[in-house]
């Protein structure tokens, strides 16, 4: 049951992190009459622009986070980013607050060490070989054991920040410095991963609901420097490989528990499925579902956490392509007229108050009768958007 927003019987969601994904979650939640409060470290973040109200705090600050939760007394606390004091969330959960999907799932998936140890050491899922390092000497030793080339990432970061490929011993110190510069929250620890020459990688959006676990059609994607660049749905998979992917996704999401959508990232090599990462929230590659599915990943997430039924059916093949800034500008302007002419394509601008070089400022979404054409149109439209 939901009440009426801004009245005493309102059902309230507190969104921790107010980026473009959270913005869409709030829009969907408000369609069900939910009162939405957005939180982030800077004013006028995308989700704040559609929320009933917002707070600006450092979410890694335990006292500030506790204060805003106790002030708002939300029915659901919905994390959207990694830079959150998860120990405070665990404390608040023991005091009766509901963290989506659970506080433990949020903590485990906020750092790569927690989720990798869970996946490989506890659940026995196939992963890339990995080591952890806390200083440069440990990193050099880990690289020797894993072998070159290999991937280095901070154990806590987002959108590919701090990730690099070590192609020779001369890259080690540079990669270490880059990882340290982008690390969030947990010192300078890094994960060193085996470089896998996979055939392709997918995101398998996995919805845990009161009625069971449902899987969206696989989403193919391309990352550049660890950051989402384009995605498409459906990505073709043979039935046995898809079944393996779904089995792996169910195993990890069942262990994490709770309700909501999970973005499970997987590599596929021949007919083998290799676990990469999981996010207990909508996934950036899943923005394509805004045009391909009966219900977008954001509607599915909102419905699942509210205990409502979901539909994961796909309607059309489609694709997404990021719109990135090439300039540094406060309150940028966008020329979108030409981009809007591209057939069966939609432009979604996030409304971020500052454009930075390489920052994701929007996305182009396209549908067609085949994925190839949709990808071409999404890319064309994205490149026609002029940010000034």
Swiss-Prot record:
Residues noted as binding ATP in the record, renumbered to the chain: 112, 153, 158-163, 193-196, 201
Ligand binding (Mg(2+)): 265, 277
Self-association and partners: Homodimer.
Binding-site list for N(1)-(5-phospho-beta-D-ribosyl)glycinamide: 20-21, 80, 284, 352, 359-360
GO biological process entries: 'de novo' IMP biosynthetic process
Gene: purT
Annotated Gene3D superfamilies: 3.40.50.20, ATP-grasp fold, A domain (3.30.1490.20), ATP-grasp fold, B domain (3.30.470.20)
Cross-referenced PANTHER family: FORMATE-DEPENDENT PHOSPHORIBOSYLGLYCINAMIDE FORMYLTRANSFERASE
Keyword field contains DNA repair: no
Native source species: Methanococcus maripaludis (strain C5 / ATCC BAA-1333)
Pfam family, one: PurT_C
Top-level EC class as recorded in UniProt: ligase
A cellular-component GO term for this protein: cytosol
Residue span(s) of domain ATP-grasp: 117-306
Catalytic reaction(s) noted: N(1)-(5-phospho-beta-D-ribosyl)glycinamide + formate + ATP = N(2)-formyl-N(1)-(5-phospho-beta-D-ribosyl)glycinamide + ADP + phosphate + H(+)
Entry's family note: Belongs to the PurK/PurT family.
Top-level division of the source organism's lineage: Archaea
Function comment: Involved in the de novo purine biosynthesis. Catalyzes the transfer of formate to 5-phospho-ribosyl-glycinamide (GAR), producing 5-phospho-ribosyl-N-formylglycinamide (FGAR). Formate is provided by PurU via hydrolysis of 10-formyl-tetrahydrofolate.
Keywords: ATP-binding, Ligase, Magnesium, Metal-binding, Nucleotide-binding, Purine biosynthesis
InterPro entries (UniProt xref): ATP-grasp, ATP-grasp_carboxylate-amine, ATP_grasp_subdomain_1, PreATP-grasp_dom_sf, PurT, PurT/PurK_preATP-grasp, PurT_C, Rudment_hybrid_motif
Lineage start: Archaea, Methanobacteriati, Methanobacteriota, Methanomada group, Methanococci
UniProt-recorded name of the protein: Formate-dependent phosphoribosylglycinamide formyltransferase
């Amino acid at each position: 049951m939901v009440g009426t927003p801004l009245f005493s019987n309102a059902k309230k969601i507190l969104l921790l992190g107010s980026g473009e994904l959270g913005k869409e979650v709030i829009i969907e939640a408000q369609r069900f009459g939910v009162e939405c409060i957005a939180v982030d470290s800077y004013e006028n973040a995308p989700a704040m622009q559609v929320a009933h109200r917002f707070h600006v705090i450092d979410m890694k600050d335990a006292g500030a986070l506790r204060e805003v939760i106790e002030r708002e007394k939300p029915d659901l606390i919905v994390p959207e980013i990694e830079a959150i004091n998860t120990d405070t969330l665990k404390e608040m959960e023991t005091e009766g607050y509901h963290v989506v999907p659970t506080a433990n799932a949020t903590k485990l998936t906020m750092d790569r060490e927690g989720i990798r140890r869970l996946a490989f050491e506890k659940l026995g899922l196939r992963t890339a070989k990995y080591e952890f390092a806390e200083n440069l000497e440990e990193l050099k030793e880990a690289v020797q054991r894993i072998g070159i080339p290999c991937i280095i990432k901070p154990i806590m970061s987002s959108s590919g920040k701090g990730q690099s490929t070590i192609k020779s011993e001369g890259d080690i110190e540079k990669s270490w410095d880059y990882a340290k510069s982008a690390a969030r929250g947990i010192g300078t620890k890094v994960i060193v991963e085996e470089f896998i020459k996979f055939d392709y990688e997918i995101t398998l959006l996995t919805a845990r609901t009161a009625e069971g676990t449902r899987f969206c059609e696989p989403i193919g994607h391309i990352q550049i420097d660890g950051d989402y660049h384009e995605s498409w749905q459906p990505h073709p998979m043979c039935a046995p490989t898809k079944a393996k992917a779904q089995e792996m996704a169910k195993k990890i999401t069942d262990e994490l528990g709770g309700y909501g959508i999970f973005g499970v990232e997987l590599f596929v090599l021949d007919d083998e499925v290799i676990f990469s990462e999981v996010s207990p929230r909508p996934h950036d590659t899943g923005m394509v579902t805004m045009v391909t599915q009966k219900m977008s990943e954001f509607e599915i997430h909102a419905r699942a956490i509210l205990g409502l039924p979901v539909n994961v059916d796909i309607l059309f093949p489609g694709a997404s392509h990021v719109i990135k800034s090439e300039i540094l500008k406060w309150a940028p302007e966008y020329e979108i007229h030409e981009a809007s002419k591209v057939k069966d394509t939609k432009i979604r601008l996030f409304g971020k108050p500052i454009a930075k070089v390489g920052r994701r400022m929007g996305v182009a979404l396209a549908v067609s009768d085949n994925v190839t054409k949709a990808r071409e149109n999404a890319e064309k439209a994205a490149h026609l958007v002029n940010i000034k």
